[in-house]
Amino acid sequence: MKVMFMLALLFSSLVATSAFRLPFQFFGANEDFNSGLTKRNYYESKPYKREFNADDLTLRFGKRGGAGEPLAFSPDMLSLRFGK
């Protein structure tokens, strides 16, 4: 009975140590696991950032009016906030 307990204890310790050792042995300890992530500069602009467009505001804040209907948001209002 003691022999079976010692064998089970040795086998479990072997399994526990191989769980940490084998991945580094087969996959390499110096492999970059975050290869898909690129670290960018904090102040660098985002490449997928859209340009600001006045039509975006007209579509968001008011529907485009017909012939005589005024817009709920006019692109001329940009000069009040953005100085353009």
Swiss-Prot record:
GO terms for cellular component: extracellular region. It comes from the Eukaryota. One of its GO terms (biological process) is neuropeptide signaling pathway. The keyword Secreted applies. The modification Phenylalanine amide is found at F61, F82. Its main location: secreted. Keywords: Amidation, Cleavage on pair of basic residues, Neuropeptide, Secreted, Signal. Each flp gene is expressed in a distinct set of neurons. Residues 1-19 form the signal peptide. It is found in: Secreted. Residues 20-48 form a propeptide. FMRFamides and FMRFamide-like peptides are neuropeptides. Belongs to the FARP (FMRFamide related peptide) family. This is FMRFamide-like neuropeptides 26.
